[in-house]
């Protein structure tokens, strides 16, 4: 098993137990055409309008029971034609890895242009204990490499890409229909508001903070963007308010003595 998958599947659940770092939304249908699937500590997101559904992220590699989750939310993954990936980490991009079963077999994949360097093995994903660790996800050729501020119209659904490098170099957020923000792993949110995502998992924390400042400014200064909901990778779904960006100059912190989110599950990986 490749190291990043081994860490995600076998190690992460043990070292993170009791630290309450994540509070993903439960699998289900929410307001504003939003649906999600929970896979342990992470969410896959969906947005539906006028019979058209787009997906944001693909979750883990070969995640057991994902078929039942799709049935629960009433979405057929084979009918999804477009999936927007926030970044190429194993818990967000594993579901379309060529080494496993592609949960969106008929979808065009969209991914931040700079993520290609991780997929190609040209750069490492993180350094731990002096060891450079590469991403191990591989996806099929033909994905669309997104630039900042690209705009798409898919069956009447408007999608705007916002480049937010830091967690990874090609990390990308998506604003959908000017009212839903999908943040991937640039934000961690608790009852006090939003923080820059945890340094432990973020490749360039200072860069991530700068990206969040730019993202907030874009939202504040663009009249047609009227956010209603924020959908995160690991903090669930939140109604948009000023607290979402309240602490973006600080990195989120977690420990057993001082959990990040008191409302989060003690063990996010229990099924």
Name each region found by the language model:
Residues 2-11, 260-271:
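C-terminal regulatory/interaction regions
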Residues 35, 84, 110, 144-146, ...:
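Hydrophobic/aromatic beta-strand patches that form the interior of the parallel beta-sheet core
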Residues 62-64, 71-150, 250-257, 261-265:
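Active-site HxH/HxHxD metal-binding segment of metal-dependent hydrolases
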Residues 67-68, 96-98, 123-124, 177, ...:
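Short amphipathic alpha-helical segments
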Residues 13-17, 23-24, 61, 113-165, 169-243, 247:
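Metallo-beta-lactamase
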Residues 54-57, 83-84, 161-163:
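Short catalytic-loop micro-motif centered on adjacent basic/acidic residues
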Residues 19-73, 173-184, 188-190:
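Conserved beta-strand hairpin/beta-sheet module of binuclear metal-dependent hydrolase folds
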């Amino acid at each position: 098993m490749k190291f990043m998958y081994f860490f995600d599947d076998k190690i992460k659940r043990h070292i993170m137990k009791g630290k309450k770092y994540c509070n993903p939304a439960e699998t289900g249908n929410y307001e504003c055409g939003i649906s999600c699937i929970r896979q342990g500590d992470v969410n896959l997101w969906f947005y539906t309008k006028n019979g058209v559904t787009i997906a944001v992220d693909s979750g883990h590699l070969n995640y057991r029971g994902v078929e039942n989750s799709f049935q629960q939310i009433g979405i057929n993954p084979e009918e999804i034609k477009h999936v927007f990936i926030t970044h190429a980490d194993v818990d967000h991009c594993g579901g379309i890895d060529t080494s496993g079963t592609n949960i969106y077999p008929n979808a065009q994949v969209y991914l931040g242009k700079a993520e290609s360097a991780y997929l190609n093995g040209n750069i490492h994903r993180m350094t731990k204990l002096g060891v450079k660790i590469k991403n191990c996800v591989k996806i099929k050729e033909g994905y669309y490499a997104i630039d900042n501020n690209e705009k798409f119209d898919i069956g009447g659904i408007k999608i705007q890409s916002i480049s937010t490098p830091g967690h990874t170099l090609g990390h990308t957020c998506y604003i959908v229909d000017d009212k839903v923000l999908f943040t991937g792993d640039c934000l961690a949110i608790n009852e006090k508001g939003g923080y820059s995502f945890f340094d432990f998992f973020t490749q360039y924390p200072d860069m991530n903070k700068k990206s969040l400042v730019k993202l907030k400014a874009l939202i504040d200064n663009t009249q047609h963007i009227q956010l209603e909901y924020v959908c995160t990778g690991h903090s669930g779904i939140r109604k948009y308010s000023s607290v979402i960006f309240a602490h973006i100059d600080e990195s989120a912190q977690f420990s057993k003595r001082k959990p990040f989110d008191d409302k989060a599950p003690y063990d996010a990986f229990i099924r």
